[in-house]
From Swiss-Prot:
InterPro entries: Neur_chan_lig-bd, Neur_chan_lig-bd_sf, Neur_channel, Neurotransmitter_ion_chnl_CS. Residues 1-24 form the signal peptide. This is Acetylcholine receptor-like protein cup-4. Disruption phenotype: Worms display a lack of uptake of GFP from the pseudocoelom into coelomocytes, suggesting a decrease or absence of endocytosis in coelomocytes. Mutants also display a slightly dumpy appearance with a low penetrance defect in distal tip cell leader function, indicating defects in coelomocyte function. Disulfide bonds join 178-192. Thought to regulate endocytosis in coelomocytes through modulation of phospholipase C activity. Possible acetylcholine receptor.
Length: 433
């Protein structure tokens, strides 16, 4: 009797429960109703297409991707610069590269289990919401639409269950106006900045530098990855900073209250610092100036005035050639004349005055004109000349009227020594300071 009761208990209670457990394990794609073959034979593109249909169903790219509109959208930005071109005549700088932008979207969400565990989706730029950014100092104007590429791809990554990370990496080619100062040519140091801003106030969109990382520079590959010299300039540093525009002013202090957020726009400034690269300046400019200055001084120690006059004319012609070659490379936009140009100008004036002086002495000696009484006082210097040099400037004491030749023998060496000292001082001031 007990055996019959035990068998009936098993038939009534245990077997239905076991059958129900087996049926529950066979539900899904492995069950009789599931289509496992169709699920596993789907290609990756088919899963992506189904995923895009799901996440973009009812999605509006014009709406900011925040379910709570009182919270702003934080956009992280990083610059990857691959080339910098500086036009010193137009006072412009053109920067090429990629700009990385990242933010979180609370509407582009999905369950990866429903799409073969896909965590990433690659879509087009126009399909998702994106911050509207402009360059305030663009040479093309504030409303230019050609600073950033419009064909960039977007990567969406699921982050948890309630939001997705959106990454965009468009290329850019930005030309901005600058205010260069080449007064210290060829040792001039200049800076130029690109000012990026969002058209929405900080109550909606806030731009910030990604982890405060400075812009990445890639001017070359492999052995040229440390390249920093482009054309006539050497890039010294590229930095980024956060700025804020409010009430017509730009400040580095972030707004505090919510009211201030509604009247403030976030800006990101990328500043490029560069110095002129002119390795041939000493050989092409300084050395000729030293040679010309030496020859000018030497003319005061040549006895023949006619030879001196011809040499001075040759100096003047050579200086014009050097000046033409220098001015051809000199930037037109300068606030003050560079010291090297001042030095060449001083040399030309010195050459001209020396030419006039020697011409006057030559004319006086040729026509044998008497020396003016005022110039006779110069012969007092003879008493202070060392005995070593007196033979060259010896003048007969019994002569009451001195000749121009006597005057030349006295003052030309003195002027030569004084000129050498002055030229050395000018070279020190103009080229070394």
């Amino acid at each position: 009797m007990k055996i019959i009761i035990f068998v009936c208990f098993i038939l009534i209670f245990y077997l239905p429960i076991q059958k129900k457990h087996v049926n529950s394990q066979q539900q899904g794609i492995d069950s009789d109703d599931g289509d496992a073959e169709s699920f596993f034979n789907k290609s990756y593109s088919e899963h992506q297409s189904a995923l895009e249909q799901k996440i973009f169903r009812g999605y509006n790219p014009k709406n900011r991707p925040m379910k709570n509109a009182s919270f702003p959208t934080i956009v992280d930005v990083h610059w990857h610069i691959i080339h910098v071109s500086i036009n010193q005549r137009e006072q412009t700088m053109t920067v090429h590269g990629h700009i990385y932008m990242r933010w979180f979207d609370e509407f582009l969400v999905w369950d990866p289990k429903d799409f073969n565990n896909i965590q990433y989706a690659r879509v087009k730029k126009w399909q998702v919401w994106q911050p509207k950014i402009k360059v305030s100092n663009s040479a093309s104007g504030l409303g230019s639409a050609f600073d950033f590429s419009t064909s960039a791809h977007v990567i969406i990554q699921m982050m948890g269950k309630d939001r997705a990370k959106v990454e965009m990496y468009p290329t850019f080619s930005i030309k901005v106006g600058c205010a260069f100062d080449f007064t210290d040519y060829p040792y001039d140091l200049n800076k130029c900045a690109i000012n990026l801003f969002s058209t929405s106030t900080m109550a909606d969109v806030q731009l910030q530098n990604l982890y405060a990382i400075p812009p990445t520079l890639s001017f070359g590959w492999e052995e040229q990855k440390m390249k920093r010299i482009i054309s006539d300039f050497k890039i010294q540093n590229v930095s980024s900073s956060a700025l804020y525009y409010t009430n017509g002013n730009i400040t580095s202090s972030a707004p505090i209250t919510g009211f201030d957020l509604g009247s403030t726009w976030s800006m990101l400034a990328v500043t490029v610092s560069f110095v002129r690269h002119s390795p041939l300046f000493e050989a092409a400019v300084v050395t000729p100036c030293i040679v010309v200055a030496s020859l000018i001084s030497m003319t005061f120690f040549i006895d023949s005035l006619s030879s001196t006059f011809l040499l001075m004319m040759l100096h003047f012609y050579v200086q014009l050639i050097f000046l033409h070659d220098l001015v051809e490379k000199l930037p037109l936009s300068v606030s003050e004349i560079p010291f090297c140009i001042k030095l060449i100008g001083i040399l030309m004036y010195t050459n001209g005055l020396t030419l006039v002086l020697h011409s006057s002495l030559l004319c006086g000696s040729y026509y044998k004109c008497p020396v003016p009484q005022q110039l006779n006082k110069i012969f007092v210097i003879e008493e202070y000349i060392p005995n070593t040099f007196k033979e060259k400037v010896q003048i007969k004491k019994e002569e009451s009227n001195k000749s121009w030749r006597d005057l030349m023998k006295l003052i030309r060496p003195i002027i030569g020594f004084v000129l050498i000292i002055l030229l050395i001082c000018m070279f020190f001031v103009c080229l070394l300071l």
